[in-house]
Amino acid sequence: MAAAFRRGCRVLRSVSHFECRTQHSKAAHKQEPGLGFSFELTEQQKEFQATARKFAREEIIPVAPEYDKSGEYPFPLIKRAWELGLINAHIPESCGGLGLGTFDACLITEELAYGCTGVQTAIEANSLGQMPVILAGNDQQKKKYLGRMTEQPMMCAYCVTEPSAGSDVAAIKTKAEKKGDEYVINGQKMWITNGGKANWYFLLARSNPDPKVPASKAFTGFIVEADTPGIHIGKKELNMGQRCSDTRGIAFEDVRVPKENVLIGEGAGFKIAMGAFDRTRPTVAAGAVGLAQRALDEATKYALDRKTFGKLLVEHQGVSFLLAEMAMKVELARLSYQRAAWEVDSGRRNTYYASIAKAFAGDIANQLATDAVQIFGGYGFNTEYPVEKLMRDAKIYQIYEGTAQIQRLIIAREHIEKYKN
């Protein structure tokens, strides 16, 4: 019965998505001269957003503090999100998914992050792990590895970062040596989200040992089953924030991977790995906006309740101005991720906008979390109140999926290139 319900839910939401895209297309052709574009969501997008919002507020927020304290993996919440169609929604319809675009996925992500970014990151790691397969997998690979994700609440992971290769992806040392119809992989990965929970990994390894070969041709992307002999999963890391998310190191010792699990072909891995970021960075930015919105809401609620010097905090100009600045920032950050998502859904290269969204939203999340703690005063520094968790959770948005500094390098490069042309 549960399986039948799941299938029915998939069909219903697939129809909704088709209608959503159709309405979007029709609206574009019916616009009045000079209107340009609309900020209005379609009814289907509002439904996705409302479903995610209800789930976050009613099911995530009440238990988020306990998951933060225990560090326990939030599988019950992930399973529920899967049942609601809030996870893996971008998997193509041909593989049993909903085939949602990046914009729709961002709407869902922002709402989930409002509830808890640890839970949202565990879910979002699936998107990053799956994206190389969505972009570069053949039909057989997609049906095998993406299809199974729609039949059961499974997880996957993106295995690229290493102990000495974070932002400098080209410094990866994990090696893949071809032997007959297999590749033998040796190396170590680090800071892998869902590392201990994944059913399979996207793994980037150097397949050409010649250091003179450019990164664009030196690396190969593989799909690796998590239970393959030779894979050793490290302990769960205790991080500053987003503690319920599963982060680990993974060692690969003579791991044999069939050639059928190579994405596109030998040497194509670097471009695949980097191309995935154009589609996942907008959703990371959306997660940061969700946290920022939560910080603003918590600070506003507190300022409307707390009294000092005989009047409400919000009646003090200094506090009201701070809230105004917070509101300005969260709205602008939201627009940045929506532009980046809209660009890629429109079929255009969005590297420039994706990096702007990721960098700006990550910075704003940290600023607003800090401002919320400031408005709470001493209470904000205490674990009995929600904003200290927001402050801890926010920092990683300036680090993972490309640091704030790397985003600025990308933005500068893209900007200068645009100016020259």
Swiss-Prot record:
The modification Phosphothreonine is found at T351. Pathway: Lipid metabolism; mitochondrial fatty acid beta-oxidation. Acetylated. Could occur at proximity of the cofactor-binding sites and reduce the catalytic activity. Could be deacetylated by SIRT3. PROSITE patterns: ACYL_COA_DH_1, ACYL_COA_DH_2. Pfam families: Acyl-CoA_dh_1, Acyl-CoA_dh_M, Acyl-CoA_dh_N. Its main location: mitochondrion. It comes from the Eukaryota. Keywords: Acetylation, FAD, Fatty acid metabolism, Flavoprotein, Lipid metabolism, Mitochondrion, Oxidoreductase, Phosphoprotein, Transit peptide. GO terms for biological process: cardiac muscle cell differentiation; carnitine biosynthetic process; carnitine metabolic process; carnitine metabolic process, CoA-linked; fatty acid beta-oxidation; fatty acid beta-oxidation using acyl-CoA dehydrogenase; glycogen biosynthetic process; heart development. Transmembrane segments: none annotated. It catalyses: a medium-chain 2,3-saturated fatty acyl-CoA + oxidized [electron-transfer flavoprotein] + H(+) = a medium-chain (2E)-enoyl-CoA + reduced [electron-transfer flavoprotein]; pentanoyl-CoA + oxidized [electron-transfer flavoprotein] + H(+) = (2E)-pentenoyl-CoA + reduced [electron-transfer flavoprotein]; hexanoyl-CoA + oxidized [electron-transfer flavoprotein] + H(+) = (2E)-hexenoyl-CoA + reduced [electron-transfer flavoprotein]; octanoyl-CoA + oxidized [electron-transfer flavoprotein] + H(+) = (2E)-octenoyl-CoA + reduced [electron-transfer flavoprotein]. InterPro entries: Acyl-CoA_dehydrogenase, Acyl-CoA_DH_CS, Acyl-CoA_Oxase/DH_mid-dom, Acyl-CoA_Oxase/DH_mid-dom_sf, AcylCo_DH-like_C, AcylCo_DH/oxidase_C, AcylCoA_DH/ox_N, AcylCoA_DH/ox_N_sf. One of its GO terms (molecular function) is acyl-CoA dehydrogenase activity. Disruption phenotype: Mice lacking Mcad show increased neonatal mortality. They display hypothermia and cold intolerance upon fasting. Their serum and bile acylcarnitine profile is also different from wild-type mice, with an elevation of serum decenoylcarnitine compared to wild-type mice. They also display hepatic steatosis following fast periods. They develop significantly elevated concentrations of urinary adipic, suberic, and sebacic acids and hexanoylglycine. The modification N6-acetyllysine is found at K30, K69, K79, K212, K217, K235, K259, K271, K301. SUPFAM superfamilies: Acyl-CoA dehydrogenase C-terminal domain-like (SSF47203), Acyl-CoA dehydrogenase NM domain-like (SSF56645). Its cofactor is FAD. It is found in: Mitochondrion matrix. Octanoyl-CoA binds at S167, S216, D278, R281, R349, T351, E401. The modification N6-succinyllysine is found at K30, K69, K179, K212, K217, K235, K259, K271. The active site is at E401. Its EC number is 1.3.8.7. Homotetramer. Interacts with the heterodimeric electron transfer flavoprotein ETF. PANTHER family: MEDIUM-CHAIN SPECIFIC ACYL-COA DEHYDROGENASE, MITOCHONDRIAL, MEDIUM-CHAIN SPECIFIC ACYL-COA DEHYDROGENASE, MITOCHONDRIAL-RELATED. Belongs to the acyl-CoA dehydrogenase family. This is Medium-chain specific acyl-CoA dehydrogenase, mitochondrial.
